[in-house]
Amino acid sequence: MNARNLARLFGTLALALFVTVSARAALEPNALFSDGAVLQQKVKVPVWGTTDLGDKVTVTLAGQEVSATPKDGHWRVELAPLAAGGPHVMTISQGSQKTEVKNILVGEVWICGGQSNMQWAVKQSDGGSEAIAGSDNDMIRLITVPRKGSDKPESNFVGKWAAAGPQTVGDFSAVGYFFGRDLQKQLHVPIGLIASNVGGTTAERWMRRSRSTRIPISRT
């Protein structure tokens, strides 16, 4: 094969790879709706994400099928209340694109938000080593929002769900984990814990700028 034909071949392969990657990246659910997720029981469940296309997005889960038309690259659907249990598989499709979110449980979901008292990790706590050693429990799932700021609202974050265990619990919020562990023992349903905490942050840091500026004290 001569150099010209080789260059054409590489060009064709590069274009095919670009088209394939672009198509796969076009439809994306929020990180909260990834493998191993926990959804809140007994209430309507919003599911959202982004897409590069304008075709309707369809979500199926536990016998339900709901659709929505994207607006400005964002889509959102709402599932009817679900009973505790699982595991389930969620299918998200748009045109020829289709993605599956596996091993979903339904139970109680709690946000572990706050400052340093919520950021304090299990491994830093009294009795932390013993708690970590005995933490294996697939009915408790953890996900952490990265500690990074932004001048504007972001539509997604980098993170994934993981079952509680010695490899995942140590760095997680101690208050959040111990609360979730006790709650799971009492309710006997899956527990999802979302860590979103940054030590030393003020209340305004957790609000949209347009809203925080309406509070007189925030302007001083």
Named regions from a protein language model:
Residues 24-220:
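Cell-envelope and extracellular/periplasmic
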Residues 1-11:
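Bacterial N-terminal signal peptides that target proteins for export
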Residues 10-20:
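Bacterial N-terminal signal peptides
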Residues 4, 19-22, 58:
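N-terminal non-cleavable signal-anchor helices
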